[in-house]
Amino acid sequence: MSQWLEKNNFSDITFFGQDWGGLIGLRMVAEHPDRFIKVAMGNTGLPYNPDTPQEIIDEVQRFRQSKIKVSLISMTKQLMQIDKGGHPALKFMYWQKFCWDAENMAIGLISSQMMEKRSKFSLAMQYLFQTLGFERFSPFTSELVKAYEAPFPDPSYKMGPRAMPTQVPIIPDASLEAQARALEFYAKFEKPFLGVFAGNDPVTNPMKDLIPKMVPNARMHPDIGGGHFFQWTRARELASVLVNFMEE
């Protein structure tokens, strides 16, 4: 991303990052501060867990390497409880293992589950067709599912989405030093900084609560709802918040 930024020679940028946009982009801002004039983030964060107990690390690693089969239902159940107490790594590891083990990852279905209103029956039948390898023939496939499956001609192209969750630093890894440098940068950040979150996304709710400590200069906007992918489900509301922030 830094090479892309430098190659295009962008400047006077207002940055907004969500999900991986924040995990990657917030560090990019810290590495090129003179190119950015304002920063906003939502449903994302900069995970930094240097003091994670060794027993938690061991349990996560054992689980990832185990032969346990994680279903879409059990994975979703664990993620929905990630902000209910306990170490978040012990919940997030279900998402990591589910993605890594899913040779034909149901990217369209997972997106549909979070981005559009569908009956449980419709979702269940779509998942059944996906599991059997007949998703292209499913009468339950929505246009959104088709759109999010379109970039992948066959399951062999899905290795990127399958692997990316294991790169989220929920336990100490090779990114620890870079995360620490970014956090040191934001602790002294003086340019306008806005946090705008859904507030009903269990995965990132804990990250929202850390922003005042992470960026003392930050201003928090009231939650706008919409779940994890609120840039899709609350597009107009989020766009309005960001446009107002840019025009201030």
Task: Name each region found by the language model.
Residues 217-248:
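Catalytic active-site module of serine/aspartate enzymes centered on a nucleophile-bearing elbow/loop
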